[in-house]
Amino acid sequence: MGKFVVLDHPLIQHKLTIIRRKDTGSNEFRRIVGEIGGLMTYEITRDLPLKDVEIETPMGKTVQKEIAGKKLTIVPILRAGIGMLNGVLDMVPSAKIAVIGMYRDEKTLKPHEYFFKAPKDIAERDCLVVDPMLATGGSANDAIAALKKRGVKEINLAVLVAAPEGIKAVQEANPDVDIYAAAEDEKLMDNGYIFPGLGDAGDRLFGTK
């Protein structure tokens, strides 16, 4: 079973409180979602493997450390996942980007994929799927399935808030995927929103509510 980890760093929790407030405007919401994405990436990548490399500083040659292993691809789920993207890229600017477009049927709450674009060598990369909300788990599971269909072996999921129902759905469908969240929220409401949640993260990010 993949692990579920709440990243309870004080800065993450403080910023999460700001974006939970209903009177936080789109500009501030957008900025802080990106900041949380960056802070989460710092924690998620804590155990990346390192290797020794010889470099030359202005003072002479020395052996130092750099990240080893497969290259990283960030996979935002459209549209709300875009809000976390720049913050993640601030931490790993060399990462490539794969984009998955999903929309949720307002009646059935089921996700539908309408777009997929990824680096040609996606099967050789580790992927970090990012989306602010893990509600039913449908979009996350479909995104993970789309990556696995294209040969990706190592996938992690980063979300801001997660409902217990979504956590369970992802763990049951994808027991090899680790989930990282800024918070595990109380429940999934009948309308498909997370409580206490963030509201509609996409609308709040793009000012379309």
Swiss-Prot record:
GO terms for molecular function: GTP binding; magnesium ion binding; uracil phosphoribosyltransferase activity. This is Uracil phosphoribosyltransferase. The keyword Transferase applies. The lineage of its organism: Bacteria, Bacillati, Bacillota, Bacilli, Lactobacillales. Catalyzes the conversion of uracil and 5-phospho-alpha-D-ribose 1-diphosphate (PRPP) to UMP and diphosphate. InterPro entries: PRibTrfase_dom, PRTase-like, Upp_B, UPRTase/APRTase, Ura_phspho_trans. It comes from the Bacteria. Uracil binds at residues 194, 199-201. Keywords: Allosteric enzyme, Glycosyltransferase, GTP-binding, Magnesium, Nucleotide-binding, Transferase. Pfam families: UPRTase. Belongs to the UPRTase family. The keyword Transit peptide does not apply. Allosterically activated by GTP. It catalyses: UMP + diphosphate = 5-phospho-alpha-D-ribose 1-diphosphate + uracil. Its EC number is 2.4.2.9. 5-phospho-alpha-D-ribose 1-diphosphate binds at residues 79, 104, 131-139, 200. Binds 1 Mg(2+) ion per subunit. The magnesium is bound as Mg-PRPP. Its cofactor is Mg(2+). Pathway: Pyrimidine metabolism; UMP biosynthesis via salvage pathway; UMP from uracil: step 1/1. One of its GO terms (biological process) is UMP salvage.
